[in-house]
């Protein structure tokens, strides 16, 4: 139904019963009232009141111009001017391959780390077979075991032959025992006993002669 025709007919019928001084603005078929400002907006009212059948065929109601629709279809929703559809498809393919290669690389890295930790657990001795070690526990045990081995190597380098090492420990114990006896005798007022091969040296008493000798040499 044409809004323009129905409104124009109703407008003339209304003024037939109520005579009114003729005014050129009142007989305009596309005006809603006598306001003069509406005359400037006449083209906009015409475009709003026309029915879809009366509209221009080049611009269908509710859709963009054909040229704009063709441009949007050729570029696509995410396309930018200057890019062809083929270039966009190639770019999308590269991105898809890059995303697919990421999980594979991460999986290989995880497998490599797990296998390295499994080998490290086998090198740690005295671990029960049913014990499940986490990665941090494995690293801590490996660090402790390395420190233990370094300590063993250092002791072997200092001691040399184990039999000679035991003999040196006995000599050291005997020396400490004789020194303790001499200090006890000095404390009780008796002259210190001489050990085998020692000679009494004249000098100050009350302290071991070795201590005095060290003080004099300084």
Curated annotation (Swiss-Prot):
The gene is HAND1. The modification Phosphothreonine is found at residue 110. Keywords: Activator, Developmental protein, DNA-binding, Nucleus, Phosphoprotein, Transcription, Transcription regulation. Residues 68-92 have a biased composition (Low complexity). It is found in: Nucleus, Nucleoplasm; Nucleus, Nucleolus. InterPro entries: bHLH_dom (IPR011598), E-box_TF_Regulators (IPR050283), HLH_DNA-bd_sf (IPR036638). Efficient DNA binding requires dimerization with another bHLH protein. Forms homodimers and heterodimers with TCF3 gene products E12 and E47, HAND2 and HEY1, HEY2 and HEYL (hairy-related transcription factors). Interacts with MDFIC. Interacts with SOX15; the interaction enhances HAND1-induced differentiation of trophoblast giant cells. GO terms for cellular component: cytoplasm; nucleolus; nucleoplasm; RNA polymerase II transcription regulator complex. The keyword Phosphoprotein applies. This is Heart- and neural crest derivatives-expressed protein 1. Phosphorylation by PLK4 disrupts the interaction with MDFIC and leads to translocation into the nucleoplasm, allowing dimerization and transcription factor activity. GO terms for molecular function: bHLH transcription factor binding; DNA-binding transcription activator activity, RNA polymerase II-specific; DNA-binding transcription factor activity, RNA polymerase II-specific; DNA-binding transcription repressor activity, RNA polymerase II-specific; enzyme binding; protein homodimerization activity; RNA polymerase II cis-regulatory region sequence-specific DNA binding; RNA polymerase II transcription regulatory region sequence-specific DNA binding. One of its GO terms (biological process) is mesenchyme development. Residues 97-149 form the bHLH domain. The keyword Transcription regulation applies. The modification Phosphoserine is found at residue 112.
